[in-house]
Amino acid sequence: MKSGRFIGVMSGTSLDGVDVVLATIDEHRVAQLASLSWPIPVSLKQAVLDICQGQQLTLSQFGQLDTQLGRLFADAVNALLKEQNLQARDIVAIGCHGQTVWHEPMGVAPHTLQIGDNNQIVARTGITVVGDFRRRDIALGGQGAPLVPAFHHALLAHPTERRMVLNIGGIANLSLLIPGQPVGGYDTGPGNMLMDAWIWRQAGKPYDKDAEWARAGKVILPLLQNMLSDPYFSQPAPKSTGREYFNYGWLERHLRHFPGVDPRDVQATLAELTTVTISEQVLLSGGCERLMVCGGGSRNPLLMARLAALLPGTEVTTTDAVGISGDDMEALAFAWLAWRTLAGLPGNLPSVTGASQETVLGAIFPANP
């Protein structure tokens, strides 16, 4: 069974940077050693946003974007290696999630698409890459997402305490770690995505630092109720979603009925949408004693305060409080999934994704010996 140093690379739906994590992994433990966040050039970020909202690209443009993202991921890995004074031979493999540009797990031909050419990463780092983690699960009838609950269960499950792990990235997803029950998990809906999109359009800021804008506004209840009527929120699990659904166009369609509203009030309403949809799912799932939050949203004081208010009797904390960096959780998970792939172990949980069976995930892109 392969063990040693692994690198995880994650570029999520928030597009706030490439997260790269170095860890030692074996069958007994996962120990994070180092991490960094690598910036995404504005031009690349905009290209990804455009394609996620349905803008048509030529095959040439699509191929170029795939190559550019692969090179970006390789640059991020090489920066971490240099910072840690490591060589390619010191790393067993890289687990690279890729950049999701479309996720459509339902319908006649279910599919998901993550780009960022793994061949570029191998060629530029000299390290074996494991990628394309989601499509095997979809081929077996699953949603292909979320995949991180298996990792949450391995690290954070408790024999007697009802726990849930909440990742608030661009999309929010919940892992249900309930003693005596199969692991559950699904996407609850928008996390930071709509808030980030709104403040970017209104104020040219990548995100609402310390929720300053949202805290200066007031929740527009009719707008909130209008958004909550979206059928995704009442859809039963297993379910997953992404930027191809909850994007700026989705927000604009709801705002048409509310002309002239204060932008800060919209920001406050979007924050409330995130916390209400999360808390409703926590309660529908039977509640928990401890909700551990990770992802960029864990640093948003308004989101954390509202979750605590909406979930009385639940200890709302961050995964940092139990020794796991909330910023690095997903990248660490894909390093762990790469280890499982190389070990020939399944990486999905049918109780989460709805797949017909457990399966080894991913494709292996071997480095030259």
UniProtKB/Swiss-Prot annotation:
Q: Which gene encodes it?
A: anmK
Q: What is the lineage of its organism?
A: Bacteria, Pseudomonadati, Pseudomonadota, Gammaproteobacteria, Enterobacterales
Q: Does the keyword Disulfide bond apply?
A: no
Spell out the family assignment given in the record's similarity comment: Belongs to the anhydro-N-acetylmuramic acid kinase family.
Annotated coiled-coil positions are none
Q: Which CDD domains match?
A: ASKHA_NBD_ANMK
Q: Can you name this protein?
A: Anhydro-N-acetylmuramic acid kinase
Please give the pathway this protein is involved in.
Amino-sugar metabolism; 1,6-anhydro-N-acetylmuramate degradation; Cell wall biogenesis; peptidoglycan recycling
Which leading EC class covers this enzyme? transferase
Question: Which terms does the record give in the GO molecular function aspect?
Answer: ATP binding; kinase activity; phosphotransferase activity, alcohol group as acceptor
Give any single GO term for biological process: 1,6-anhydro-N-acetyl-beta-muramic acid catabolic process
